[in-house]
């Protein structure tokens, strides 16, 4: 328990920076989408309601394992790209944040029903911890460059533990997100738009 408190204390700034990047570009995606969609605001919801007789639970369910695997692959790319000074990591998170913000700007009701149930776990949890992990790797890399020694950069007893714990948190959040997205989100979507 002491380690967990220390982890959040040691890495608070990196977690907040990661969260800020995600949220700023999420809102940019939502605002730009809202402006671009114009009078077609809410069109997806209208189309879903019009075709509600043909929507079944099996039509909108997705295998939790395939969702988890896909999201894990993307977030592992973000995490590992910390080796490249987190530049690629930040670009991927920005792209994902804009992409996930866009549906909220173009059709808030549809996005609230189909994305919001798993949003916290997949994006606020998974993506934020993936980017935090990338920043921790970059921080380790910069320390190694400054000290001109990998061994000396590992002298802090928490460096590798923090990276590993961040990875574990990311995986846990993505696993919960996949379960919610696979089993809960389709039920909510069906209740909102189905029979």
State where each predicted segment sits.
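Interfacial helix-start motif at the membrane-water boundary
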Residues: 54-85
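Terminal transmembrane helical module of multi-pass membrane proteins
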Residues: 138-195
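Hydrophobic alpha-helical membrane-insertion segments
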Residues: 21-34, 121-128, 170-173
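Cytosolic juxtamembrane amphipathic/interface segments immediately preceding
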Residues: 1-14, 73-74, 149-161
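Transmembrane alpha-helix/helix-exit interface in multi-pass inner-membrane proteins
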Residues: 31-38, 79-106
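Interfacial/capping segments of alpha-helical transmembrane domains
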Residues: 31-53, 188
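N-terminal signal-anchor transmembrane alpha helix
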Residues: 8-41
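Alpha-helical transmembrane segments of helical membrane proteins, especially in multi-pass transport
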Residues: 117-140, 166-169
């Amino acid at each position: 328990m002491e380690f967990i408190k220390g982890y959040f204390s040691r890495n608070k700034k990196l977690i907040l920076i990661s969260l800020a990047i995600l949220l700023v570009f999420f809102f940019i995606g939502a605002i730009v989408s809202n402006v671009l969609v114009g009078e077609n605001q809410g069109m997806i919801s209208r189309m879903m309601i019009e075709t509600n007789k043909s929507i079944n639970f099996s039509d909108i369910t997705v295998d939790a394992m395939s969702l988890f695997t896909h999201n894990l692959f993307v977030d592992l790319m973000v995490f590992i790209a910390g080796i490249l000074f987190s530049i690629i990591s930040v670009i991927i998170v920005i792209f994902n944040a804009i992409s996930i913000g866009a549906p909220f700007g173009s059709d808030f009701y549809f996005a609230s029903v189909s994305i919001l149930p798993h949003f916290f776990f997949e994006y606020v949890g998974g993506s934020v911890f993936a980017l935090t992990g990338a920043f921790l790797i970059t921080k380790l890399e910069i320390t190694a460059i400054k000290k001109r020694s990998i061994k000396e950069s590992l002298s802090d007893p928490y460096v590798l533990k923090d990276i590993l714990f961040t990875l574990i948190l990311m995986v846990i959040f993505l696993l919960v997100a996949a379960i919610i997205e696979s089993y809960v989100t389709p039920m909510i979507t069906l209740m909102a738009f189905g029979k």
